[in-house]
Amino acid sequence: MPLPVQVFNLQGAVEPMQIDVDPQEDPQNAPDVNYVVENPSLDLEQYAASYSGLMRIERLQFIADHCPTLRVEALKMALSFVQRTFNVDMYEEIHRKLSEATRSSLRELQNAPDAIPESGVEPPALDTAWVEATRKKALLKLEKLDTDLKNYKGNSIKESIRRGHDDLGDHYLDCGDLSNALKCYSRARDYCTSAKHVINMCLNVIKVSVYLQNWSHVLSYVSKAESTPEIAEQRGERDSQTQAILTKLKCAAGLAELAARKYKQAAKCLLLASFDHCDFPELLSPSNVAIYGGLCALATFDRQELQRNVISSSSFKLFLELEPQVRDIIFKFYESKYASCLKMLDEMKDNLLLDMYLAPHVRTLYTQIRNRALIQYFSPYVSADMHRMAAAFNTTVAALEDELTQLILEGLISARVDSHSKILYARDVDQRSTTFEKSLLMGKEFQRRAKAMMLRAAVLRNQIHVKSPPREGSQGELTPANSQSRMSTNM
C-alpha cells in the first residue's frame, strides 16, 4: 500500500494516517520471482536474433526459467550460442538445465497415454572434448594478452596499453568473468588520450555494469560520457557517430532508471533515442525501446506530455512501428478508449513477463496505467455513474468501487463514493475562494520581492559593505590588514 494514506471527510481533511511500512518492502511492490508463463506468443528465433553476446544467452535462460512450453527450445538455443564463446562454466550450467528439462518432458510424455513421442527429445551429450579444448584456448589467449600488456607497459606507449586493457577485458567478458572484465575496462581510463577513448571506455564499463545489474555504476558512467567535450559541446545538428553514441547512452540510462523504478525519467531517456542510430544489441533492441518507453510514458505522462513527447515524436513513431500493439495501446489510451486499451495490455502481458528487465515492473506499471485511466476518465465530471464506469473499464462495480476507494485514500482522486447509489461525486471545491487565496499569496510574494529589491538598491547606492564577523580564536591576532585598519581608526 503506497505511503502516506490520506483519509478525507466532508468537513475537511484530517491528518494523514501513517503506516510504518517501507515502500520497498511492500508486498505490492515486491516482484514475484517464481511466476510461470503458460501461453506466450513469442517467436524465439526472431527474439534471440535481436541480441548478441551475453545478453542473448541471459535472456534465453530467463525465458527457460519462467516458461515451461519454451524451456527446452530456449535452452537448446542458448547452448548453441554459448559454444561460440569461452564461457565453459555457463555451457555446463545450461547443459545441466537442459538435461533436467528434457527428462521432465519425457516423464510428462510417458504419463500422457495419447501423446505422440517427439523426435530429438533426448538432450545432447556433454561435449567434454570442446570443454577441455576451450579451457586450454582461453588460458593460452589470457597468457598471451597478459604478456602483450606487460610489454606495452615496458615501452610506455599509452595507446598500446589502453588497447591491451580493452583486449584483456573483452577476453574476460567472453569467458564470463565479469568482475575482471570490469577491472580491465576501468584501468583503461588512465591511458585515454582523447575524448573518443574516454567514451569507448565508458561504453565498455556501462555494458559490463548492466550485466552485473550495478545500476548506480551505469548512471555514473553515462554522466561521465555525456560530459566529455565531444558530446557536451555539440549543439544542434550532431554527426551520425555522435548521435549513435548518445543513443547508446540514453538507452543504458533508461534501463538503469527503469530498474530503479523511476519510470518517468526512464521514459524521458528512452524517448531521446534515435531510431536510425539505435544499434546496441549487447543491451537492448529497438523493440525494447518502444515497449519500455511506451509503457513508462503511459504510466507517468499526462495527456499533454503524452501527445507532445510520444504521439507527435517523429523519432519515437519509428520505434512504435516495430511494436504496433504498443502503438495501438497508446492511441486507444489517448482517445479515452480505456476498455480496448486495457484489454490489449492484458493480451501482451505474458510476453512482457518473459522480458528479464521489464518483468519485475509489469504489475506496477499496469496498476499505474489503470489508475491514470480512472483519474482521466473522472476528471471532467462532477459526478459519475459507477455502472457505466465499470462497463467502460470492463470490470464489476464492486471491484471498481474498491479501486476508486484506494485512489481516494491515496489522494489521487478528490471525490467521495456513494455506495448505496453507486455514484462517484467530485469533492465540492469553491473555485472562487481558491482563486482569491492564490491571488493574495501571489500579491504578498510580489511585495516581499519588491521590498528586497528596494533594500538592495539603497545598500548599493550608499556603498554600504557588511563585513563578516571575525572567526573564533582570531580576536587577539593581528594580520597586516586588520592591524593597519586598527591604526587608522585610532588616529
Swiss-Prot record:
Keyword Nucleotide-binding in record: no
Residues with the Phosphoserine modification: S468, S474, S483
Subcellular localization, as worded in the UniProt entry: Cytoplasm; Nucleus
Entry-annotated residues carrying Phosphothreonine: T479
Alphabetically ordered keywords of this record: Cytoplasm, Nucleus, Phosphoprotein, Signalosome
Region (Disordered): 465-491
Domain text: The PCI domain is necessary and sufficient for the interactions with other CSN subunits of the complex. Mediates the interaction with CAPN8. The N-terminal part (1-216), which is not required for deneddylating activity and CSN complex formation, is nevertheless essential for other aspects of CSN complex function, such as repression of c-fos/FOS expression.
Functional summary from the UniProt entry: Essential component of the COP9 signalosome complex (CSN), a complex involved in various cellular and developmental processes. The CSN complex is an essential regulator of the ubiquitin (Ubl) conjugation pathway by mediating the deneddylation of the cullin subunits of SCF-type E3 ligase complexes, leading to decrease the Ubl ligase activity of SCF-type complexes such as SCF, CSA or DDB2. The complex is also involved in phosphorylation of p53/TP53, c-jun/JUN, IkappaBalpha/NFKBIA, ITPK1 and IRF8/ICSBP, possibly via its association with CK2 and PKD kinases.
Name this protein carries in UniProt: COP9 signalosome complex subunit 1
Recorded name of the encoding gene: GPS1
